[in-house]
Amino acid sequence: VMNNPEYMEVLKITSTPNSISTLTAAACTEMFKDNGYINESQSQIFTERNLIYSAMSTNKNVKLFKPYANYMLVKILKDDISANQIASQCNLKGIVIRNCENIRGLSNKYIRFCFMKPEQNDLLVNTILELL
């Protein structure tokens, strides 16, 4: 199947873009039973989302897409910096962000990251802003 271009095209069209494993699905199902965890997570995400958006919104080298979930999409406006460069620098500091160049409609000028713990978010924002 994998060597047949026709089958691969059908799989590409019909498959879920970000599928999850059975183990991940089971963990998520259990997690959603814990209301305390859900409320605490929502509160932390709300706080961190607003702090990060405020901290980055004054930089003219990025376009922020206002987040309404637990992640933010950012377009890099500085010509000599790519998403790969930012992702590599973040990775060196133990922070994983998504280079969005392989997402249809985006390019190597887009990154996406989830909101984390405050200390990790501070390191993330400082790393990105130092490059820009």
Predicted regions: what is each one?
Residues V1-T58, V62-F65:
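PLP-dependent aminotransferase class I/II
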Residues N3, T16, L77-K78, M116:
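Structured loop/turn residues at secondary-structure junctions
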Residues L11, I86, L124-T127:
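Hydrophobic side chains in well-ordered alpha-helices
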Residues S15, R49, R98, R112-C114:
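Short, cationic motifs built from Arg/Lys/His that form the positively charged side of catalytic pockets
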Residues A27, M72-L73, L106-S107:
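Short secondary-structure capping/turn micro-motifs that flank functional sites
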Residues Q44, A55, Q89, T127-E130:
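Alpha-helical scaffold elements within enzyme catalytic domains, especially in hydrolases
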Residues I45-F46, N50, N59-K93, F115:
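Conserved PLP-binding catalytic core of the aspartate aminotransferase-like
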Residues L92-K93, N102-L132:
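PLP-dependent enzyme catalytic core of the Aspartate aminotransferase-like
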